[in-house]
Design a protein with these regions (language model features):
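N-terminal Rossmann NAD(P)H-binding glycine-rich loop of SDR-like oxidoreductase domains
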Residues: 1-24
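Non-catalytic, hydrophobic alpha-helical segments
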Residues: 12, 54, 165-169, 184, ...
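NAD(P)H-binding glycine-rich loop region in Rossmannoid oxidoreductase-like domains
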Residues: 22-86, 97-106
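Conserved beta-loop-beta element that borders a ligand/cofactor-binding pocket
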Residues: 87-90, 95-101, 113-136, 185
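A conserved pocket-lining segment of Rossmann-fold NAD(P)-dependent short-chain dehydrogenase/reductase
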Residues: 125-126, 139-160, 164
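Glycine/proline-rich active-site loop of Rossmann-fold NAD(P)-dependent oxidoreductases
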Residues: 135-141, 145-147, 172-182, 205-207
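Glycine-rich Rossmann NAD(P)(H)-binding loop
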Residues: 152-156, 182-189, 214
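Mobile cap/lid helix-loop segments that border enzyme active or cofactor-binding sites
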Residues: 189, 196-255
Length: 255
């Protein structure tokens, strides 16, 4: 089966391509680097010709409020139109757990607009909402650092490994569309500030983490400490944080 992964050269997309190729599917990794631009529509028709499934894990290059909304709305419109023309039978999209609760952020407003466009289209679809990735914990620390101190709120947090997200997307791509939303989370629940503290300590990063209930998460002050958690019955990834952290720090210290 021919499957197109839009954003197929990035962290998640490249893993999805690899997993599905191992299952002997014909894979196309579509991205600006391979001549496919979802904003202009360039290369979409050619990439989708003969495909049965499209997996969209693309992300906006600019997270400014206007730019990110333009990216997700325009890309969704172009991708879905190209899929309709190509007769695609299953559109799989990656989104974020808690999107509807984080509408104070321009990024999450744009992700919700993307989801709404998918649901309104005629292409059968599955939206996978995932919690944050372990791989981005360092970025969270960086975005919350001022004068060498990391200030973070004690939000509940159920992150997961990128490998588990890719595995779920690959599994969904091989299955029937649910025409709805599926949630995916890690196997453990933490407080955000404590998890970042553990990550920095293991990475031998000297930054001090201060717990501050009013500190923003990616620029957004969140009053609901459960806003980043999935609902009652998510799919659960296999990788525990300690195991991922051990492997990651071992790679960092290997000459």
């Amino acid at each position: 089966m021919k499957i197109v992964v839009i954003g197929g050269t990035g962290l998640i997309g490249s893993k999805v391509v690899s997993r599905l190729r191992d299952q002997e599917h014909e894979m196309v990794a579509a991205s600006p680097a391979t001549g496919v631009d979802t904003v202009t529509g360039q290369g979409l028709a050619e990439a989708l010709a003969g495909a049965r499934v499209v997996v969209d894990v693309s992300n906006a290059p600019d997270w400014g409020d206007t730019a990110v909304m333009d990216f997700f709305q325009t890309s969704a419109r172009n991708i879905l139109a190209a899929e309709t023309a190509a007769g695609i039978g299953h559109h799989v999209a990656l989104s974020v757990v808690g999107t509807e609760r984080l509408q104070g952020s321009g990024y999450f407003r744009a992700k919700l607009a993307q989801e709404e466009a998918i649901k309104a289209a005629y292409v059968p679809s599955t939206i996978l909402r995932a919690t944050q990735f372990f791989e981005f914990i360092g970025r969270i620390a960086d975005s919350s650092t001022h004068d060498g101190t990391v200030r973070l709120p004690p939000l509940f947090f159920q992150p997961q490994a990128a490998d588990d997200v890719a595995a779920a997307l690959a599994d969904i791509a091989e299955g029937a569309p649910v025409n709805g939303t599926v949630e995916l989370a890690g196997p453990e629940r933490f407080r955000l500030d404590e998890l970042v503290r553990r990550y920095l300590r293991a990475s031998k990063d000297p930054r001090h983490v201060v717990t501050d209930a009013r500190a923003p998460y990616y620029g957004l002050e969140i009053n609901d400490e459960r806003a980043l958690l999935p609902g009652d019955h998510p799919r659960i990834g296999a990788t525990r944080f300690a195991d991922w952290l051990s492997r990651t720090t071992a790679k960092q210290t290997t000459p």
